[in-house]
Amino acid sequence: MMRVLVVEDNALLRHHLKVQLQDSGHQVDAAEDAREADYYLNEHLPDIAIVDLGLPDEDGLSLIRRWRSSDVSLPVLVLTAREGWQDKVEVLSSGADDYVTKPFHIEEVMARMQALMRRNSGLASQVINIPPFQVDLSRRELSVNEEVIKLTAFEYTIMETLIRNNGKVVSKDSLMLQLYPDAELRESHTIDVLMGRLRKKIQAQYPHDVITTVRGQGYLFELR
């Protein structure tokens, strides 16, 4: 399963991509413009982005260049109607990793996504290490003092997000969106229950409270 960011201004195509990707088991954030794409990029930490070039507020190539200049390293797959070789060179030169020309079959998009993730897995670290905490991204495991802590899928998602944002407050709404993409399933007290369980499991291996509730803002992971 991947978290996919789809950036497409055409509402029908955006919805089609989102549904097809979700049906394949992926989590999907769908943005209609560059501003919304920036929000999802920073809040939800996607594994890969699918970007259309014709966005209403910023050209797709400009968006990709801006991401790359800010050291955003996630794989980017471009959707384009431009078929000339010069256009394809420009797409790849912008910092995109691959492209699909319109019209396309969703199977081709899926195949290119998987290829990019395989290629990227050899380049990016699969472990986040903040001693004595360690997150194995490929195994989806949290270890403390080299002991694996058994977490549910929701608990792991919360811990990975907090540790990725070490020292930064993560909003409650952001966590809720990651756990429950469907708004009808969200209940704010669920996060509080999960946090309580997480703290107990962690304190069995590490005596200090590393998850702080920041009133009115969210949650903070920080070693003391």
UniProtKB/Swiss-Prot annotation:
A cellular-component GO term for this protein: protein-DNA complex
Residues modified as 4-aspartylphosphate: D52
Domain Response regulatory: 3-117
Subcellular location: Cytoplasm
Note: PhoP/PhoQ-signaling cascade, which activates virulence membrane proteins (PagC, PagO, PagD, PagK, PgtE and PhoN), is induced by cationic antimicrobial peptides (CAMP) (polymyxin, alpha-helical peptide C18G and sheet peptide protegrin-1) at sublethal concentrations.
Complex formation: Monomer in the inactive, unphosphorylated state and dimer in the active, phosphorylated state.
CDD domains membership: REC_OmpR_EcPhoP-like, trans_reg_C
Induction of synthesis: The phoP/phoQ operon is positively autoregulated by both PhoP and PhoQ in a Mg(2+)-dependent manner. Repressed by RcsB via sigma factor RpoS. Induced by acidic pH and by low magnesium.
DNA-binding residues (ranges): 125-223
Principal location: cytoplasm
GO molecular function: DNA-binding transcription activator activity; phosphorelay response regulator activity; transcription cis-regulatory region binding
Protein modification: Phosphorylated and dephosphorylated by PhoQ.
Keyword entries, A-Z: Activator, Cytoplasm, DNA-binding, Growth regulation, Phosphoprotein, Repressor, Transcription, Transcription regulation, Two-component regulatory system, Virulence
Deletion consequences: Decreases survival in macrophages. Decreases tolerance to acid stress. Abnormal expression of genes encoding virulence proteins. Decreases fitness in the spleen and liver of mouse. 10,000-fold reduction in virulence in male BALB/c mice (for strain ATCC 14028). Double knockout with phoQ decreases virulence in mouse.
Lineage of the organism: Bacteria, Pseudomonadati, Pseudomonadota, Gammaproteobacteria, Enterobacterales
Protein name: Virulence transcriptional regulatory protein PhoP
Alphabetical list of InterPro entries matching this protein: CheY-like_superfamily (IPR011006), OmpR/PhoB-type_DNA-bd (IPR001867), Sig_transdc_resp-reg_receiver (IPR001789), WalR-like (IPR039420), WH-like_DNA-bd_sf (IPR036388)
